[in-house]
Swiss-Prot record:
GO function terms (MF aspect): DNA binding; tyrosine-based site-specific recombinase activity
CDD domains: INT_XerDC_C (cd00798)
A Pfam family the protein falls into: Phage_int_SAM_1
Stated role: Site-specific tyrosine recombinase, which acts by catalyzing the cutting and rejoining of the recombining DNA molecules. The XerC-XerD complex is essential to convert dimers of the bacterial chromosome into monomers to permit their segregation at cell division. It also contributes to the segregational stability of plasmids.
Translocase recorded as keyword: no
Positions of the catalytic residues: R153, K177, H253, R256, H279, Y288 (o-(3'-phospho-dna)-tyrosine intermediate)
Organism field: Bifidobacterium longum (strain NCC 2705)
GO terms for biological process, alphabetical: cell division; chromosome segregation; DNA transposition
This protein's name: Tyrosine recombinase XerD
Gene Ontology CC annotation, any one: cytoplasm
Assembly: Forms a cyclic heterotetrameric complex composed of two molecules of XerC and two molecules of XerD.
Family the entry assigns: Belongs to the 'phage' integrase family. XerD subfamily.
Keyword annotations from UniProtKB, A to Z: Cell cycle, Cell division, Chromosome partition, Cytoplasm, DNA integration, DNA recombination, DNA-binding
Length: 308
């Protein structure tokens, strides 16, 4: 990466990470997208931001298409490029945002992986297998109940602190993207699981820490008494899913998708679900308003005058 791009990229990453307060994982994704974009530009002999044209941006997206990138991946990369060019314009590194008129490629909307209510029940039941007095089992059960009850992102679960939970009021405070806080209800199942973990699990995990100053704030601790990591949550979800016999692709975000879908199917208003999820735009939430094939068939059979 040449000097013309290097300084601008560094400033951009500081802007989104510090000034806008985006999560570390989000900043890393932006960094990767922009680095690949600039590498491609430099293969075309473009080494300064103000040398980029609209055609270059369009050609890059076309190159991604030829490389077999999915529509979702291309749309995400273009969104990163849009942010980068807008920032460059604001910094007077360019005289125009040449990416502004470049539209995201159209593609089939892919619905997120969602568990049925029965599958969620099996997953949460499987988390309790292994003994109710084992602190790790108590933690896993509390963690998964918390994630399904709140629909939180994995970063919000790992970042949760003890003082973010009010078990008497059944409320949790989540720190979302851009350091935006929101309050979400905690159901009775989650409250019972968290209470059991706090009473008989967390203290023992905290004592396992070799640190001079124990982890006093974090809600969920790992086996060594430190704040639990994103990777650990992934491993817990995967292992618990295997014990539950769930064959669908399973990751922490699956619980968030399932939370939203089950609320919509239960009659919740999409605007309410938007607030619970912490989405900035209702458009993002509307993917959960999809109708299941079973519901479509049932509605058709009961509504169409010549269905039967």
């Amino acid at each position: 990466m040449t000097n013309g791009f290097t300084r601008l990229t560094e400033q951009f990453l500081i802007h989104i990470g510090v000034e806008r307060g985006l999560a570390t994982a989000t900043v890393t994704a932006y960094e990767s997208d922009i680095a690949k974009y600039i590498d491609w530009l430099e293969t075309r002999g473009i080494h300064e931001p103000d040398a980029i044209t609209k055609q270059d941006v369009e050609d890059y997206i076309a190159a991604l298409d030829q490389a077999g990138e999915s529509a979702r991946s291309k749309a995400r990369r273009l969104a990163s490029i849009h942010e980068f060019h807008r920032f460059a314009l604001g910094q007077h590194a360019v005289t125009a945002d040449v990416s502004a008129a470049v539209k995201a490629p159209k593609g089939a909307s892919t619905l997120p992986d969602v568990l049925t209510v029965d599958e969620v029940t099996r997953l949460l039941d499987a988390a309790a297998v292994g003994g109710s007095t084992d602190p790790v089992v108590l933690r896993d059960k509390a963690l998964l109940e918390f994630m399904y009850a709140t629909g939180c992102r994995v970063s919000e679960a790992t970042g949760a602190n003890l003082d973010d939970i009010d078990l008497d009021e059944h409320i949790a405070r989540l720190m979302g993207k851009g350091s935006k806080q929101r309050l979400v209800p905690l159901g009775s199942y989650a409250c019972r699981a968290i209470t059991a973990y706090l009473n008989a699990g967390r203290g023992e995990l905290e004592q396992r820490s070799s640190a001079k100053i124990p982890e006093r704030r974090a809600l969920f601790l790992n086996k060594r008494g430190k704040r639990i990591s994103r990777q650990s949550v992934w491993e817990i979800v995967k292992a618990t899913g295997e014990r539950a016999g769930i064959t669908k692709p399973l990751h922490p975000h699956t619980l968030r998708h399932s939370f939203a879908t089950h609320l919509i199917q239960g009659g919740a208003d999409v605007r309410t679900v938007q607030e619970l999820l912490g989405h900035a735009s209702v458009t993002t939430t509307q993917i959960y308003t999809h109708v299941s094939p079973e519901t479509l068939i049932e509605t058709y059979l009961t509504s169409h005058p010549r269905a039967r």
